[in-house]
Amino acid sequence: MPDGVGRELPRDGTVLAFDYGEKKIGVALGNFVTRHATALTILPNVSVEGRFQAVGELIREWTPVQLVVGMPVNPEGGEQPSMRLARRFGNQLNGRYSLPVEWVDERYSSRMAAMGGARRGELDAEAARIILQQYFDQLPL
């Protein structure tokens, strides 16, 4: 669920969403006008420097006003080890780029991506698209 309680959301602008994984990071793109998410790319996650160089290039290219990070909670809604990594990644995004970060429960996003017909090499970007679409769908009109 978005946690920007009390913060006014932009009426316009681009949003980038991330499905953080230890080996790959899926990225999706959308905007506040259409509230439609599109799978964008998959970034290799091999080093901190490489990760943030690639993210920085996307931020310069797309100039987002908001970032969204999937939060991998377990099926019961509780913490799991990968949550800490995703939270750290989102906090680093906020610190490096001074952009607001929202968290979205990403339970089953990868499974939904596979069931939706995404090819194996596109699963992470499609999972990011699902995360971003969930974010848009739960925003007030």
UniProtKB/Swiss-Prot annotation:
InterPro entries: RNaseH-like_sf, YqgF, YqgF/RNaseH-like_dom, YqgF/RNaseH-like_dom_sf
Primary role: Could be a nuclease involved in processing of the 5'-end of pre-16S rRNA.
Compartment(s) where it occurs, according to its Swiss-Prot or TrEMBL record: Cytoplasm
Biological process, per Gene Ontology: rRNA 5'-end processing
GO MF, one annotated term: nuclease activity
Name assigned to this protein: Putative pre-16S rRNA nuclease
Family, per entry: Belongs to the YqgF nuclease family.
GO cellular component, one term: cytosol
Entry keywords, A to Z: Cytoplasm, Hydrolase, Nuclease, Ribosome biogenesis
Segments passing through the bilayer: none
EC number(s) stated in the UniProt entry for this protein: 3.1.-.-
Enzyme type, top EC level: hydrolase
